[in-house]
């Protein structure tokens, strides 16, 4: 009896000794972790000048050495109703939720894949066709190779798919037109390759739409339910969801985006196109019309605090507190530079050369990685300096500069605030 008790105590002690307890975020002043507060404060006035010049809003959070050292909001979550400036615009707060756009690729799809890889439920060298039946070359395809595509090819954006087939716009998509999720998967299978796989690099939303379907195939769960129940909820995240208006959130909690739906101020038309100011619905057309708001490439909403926790998971090597999602080897595997393009890991953008200066600035370490989102979002994670930055914005919440010349350039997109690197450099430049 005594031997059993002693053995039990020793076993319990041994297990607790090996239990992983990851750092959790706490609040600290900038000076406590090596910043010059006066230099960092200059950023405040510069961002406010951009808001005064017409940039809708910016939410910024900075992490250094496991501490949140700066969290602030500037501007307006909603200042327009259509083309009309509101008499009483809604100010952005540090709790405002934003449409992450392509940062969804990292903090929903990549996080899910990293977890599944760590658990041994998927290998990045697996064929896509293993998880998506019927994923193969079509009889009329000029470029062959779909049946040999691997998940790693999709993650590296070298699979051969076009950047944006515009499935919901029948005028552009033609026979690939789809405004339902079940049809969209079939249209993806039929989407012809534009180049021989692994011969060049084209960043493609289709790649991450495919990855979303693969995750659903493995987990037997919708993508949103999987990440919300197995990643976000265990981490204690309360403002990171797909389709927020269907999950208890209200428009005033969320930053608005395009003024006239997806029409780019009236120059784009297709069946069922939204024309009202987008407020709480994902902006991305493929995510909304073709995927019901939940896609591997876009659709996630979050705030800066929740994003800080997710970035800290990466800095920690895969966990937070007593929760382990994946390990440091998985983080290294996914953030390692691609042989085809040094600015890509497995999905993650990497600070691999000077072409990334507009994103990561000139002062971040070459090991820095993260992603951007079309709506005005940036995440930057620097493992060398143990530092991370998240910028959330609603750049499309302004008029289109010249709809007939380029419907994708908004007035706010012409301001310096539309480029993230200068903000990143000002933060790094404030280090002592």
From Swiss-Prot:
- Kindly give the Gene3D superfamilies that the UniProt entry links to this protein: DD-peptidase/beta-lactamase superfamily
Q: What is this protein called?
A: Putative D-alanyl-D-alanine carboxypeptidase
Where does it sit, as one GO cellular component term? Answer: plasma membrane
Q: Which GO terms describe its molecular function?
A: serine-type D-Ala-D-Ala carboxypeptidase activity
Membrane-topology annotation of the record: Single-pass membrane protein
Q: Its Enzyme Commission number?
A: 3.4.16.4
Disulfide cysteine pairs (residue numbers): none
Mark the transmembrane ranges: 7-25
The record lists the organism as Salmonella gallinarum (strain 287/91 / NCTC 13346)
- The positions making up the signal sequence are none
A GO BP entry: proteolysis
Main location as per UniProt: membrane
**Family membership noted in the UniProt record:** Belongs to the peptidase S12 family. YfeW subfamily.
- Catalytic activity, as annotated: Preferential cleavage: (Ac)2-L-Lys-D-Ala-|-D-Ala. Also transpeptidation of peptidyl-alanyl moieties that are N-acyl substituents of D-alanine
- Keywords assigned by UniProt? Carboxypeptidase, Cell inner membrane, Cell membrane, Hydrolase, Membrane, Protease, Transmembrane, Transmembrane helix
InterPro entries listed in its UniProt record: Beta-lactam-related, Beta-lactam/transpept-like, Diverse_Enzym_Activities, Pept_S12_YfeW/YbbE-like
The record's subcellular locations are: Cell inner membrane
Please report a single Pfam family linked to this protein. Answer: Beta-lactamase
Keyword Cell inner membrane applies: yes
